Amino acid sequence: MKKTLLAEFTAREGARDEVARLIGDYARAVREEEGNLVFDVYTRASAPRAFWIFEVYRDEDAFQAHLKAPYGGPFNVALAPLIEEDASVLTFLDPLSVRA
């Protein structure tokens, strides 16, 4: 079963450009992971400092491999002082089966 999540955080005032640079570099690395299917980065139209990252991994093993990637820790350390939250807020999603 695919592992899908939404990661959210808000850049501190004056840090948006640095956060955008960091997440751009990180996105390029994550998209190269064998088990990553989607890593799309968005900002909220009405609040451009609010970042939303929609992530999909092939399965739980692929997600665990993502968590162990060597660039994840340094990314989170660099990101932490630039965002309002203590860390990214993660929301795990399950697909809804809808019959046509």
Language model region names:
Residues 1, 18, 89-92:
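Terminal low-complexity, poorly structured segments
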Residues 3-33, 37-41:
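N-terminal first-folded block
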Residues 3-10, 40-67:
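Short, well-ordered beta-strand segments in beta-rich or mixed alpha/beta enzyme
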Residues 14, 46-48, 70, 74:
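Short alpha-helical
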Residues 16-18, 50, 62, 99:
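Intrinsically disordered, low-complexity acidic/polar segments
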Residues 25, 29-37, 56-90:
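An amphipathic, aromatic/His-enriched active-site/gating alpha helix that lines ligand/cofactor pockets
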Residues 41-49, 76-100:
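Glycine-rich beta-strand-turn "strand-cap" elements at beta-sheet edges
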